[in-house]
Amino acid sequence: EATGEPYRQAVGGMSAGNGSLMCLAPVAMAFCDDPDAAAQFSADSSRTTHPAVECVEACGVYGRLIAAAIEGASRTELYVLAADLAEQMTNPDLATILRGSYRVKGRDEISSSGYVLHSLEAALWAFASTDDFLEGALLAVNLGDDADTVGAIYGQLAGALYGRSGIPENWRDRLHDTGMIEDLAAGIADRVGTFEVVVG
């Protein structure tokens, strides 16, 4: 039955899945010139399907990190930004992750389950543990469990940092509809700064 509410009602806890965190790149790309908008619209994109507080906050902060990487932030600058954003989080576990707790953990301390904070931590761990796209992607997906989603979450930030040329050409060429994907990305890039959000 319709409630008239534009967003789903939050449930939270371990039912807070990672689905909205894996598909932020287009939003972050569209608003990469406006960090606050990138964060806000990334968070809003989660509310439609994954309204738990930790999902919404994780999407907001990750969208902002992706946007910063697109705009040229270094790895170190991304770590500093994440730590700064941790102060705005209401979820203490998310704040701990953003402060870099994953950077001192070993493989056996990382969970790659479907829970949004586990997946975020796993993706950031793979990102911090390697210095090129391929190695990090392999590390992320070989954690097991929800491997494809963790790989996608990793790939958004790593792709933004390393750029198109940092992704192995033979991987790009083997994607289904590579041309369509690149055309869509180019279309978003060409329109940065022109997107208008219509509510209602």
Q: In which residue ranges do the predicted regions lie?
A:
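Phosphate-handling active-site elements
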Residues: 32-38, 132-135, 162-175
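Conserved catalytic/binding loops enriched for acidic/polar residues
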Residues: 148
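Conserved glycine-rich phosphate/nucleotide-binding loop
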Residues: 160-200
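Amphipathic alpha-helical interface segments
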Residues: 1-130, 136-143, 157
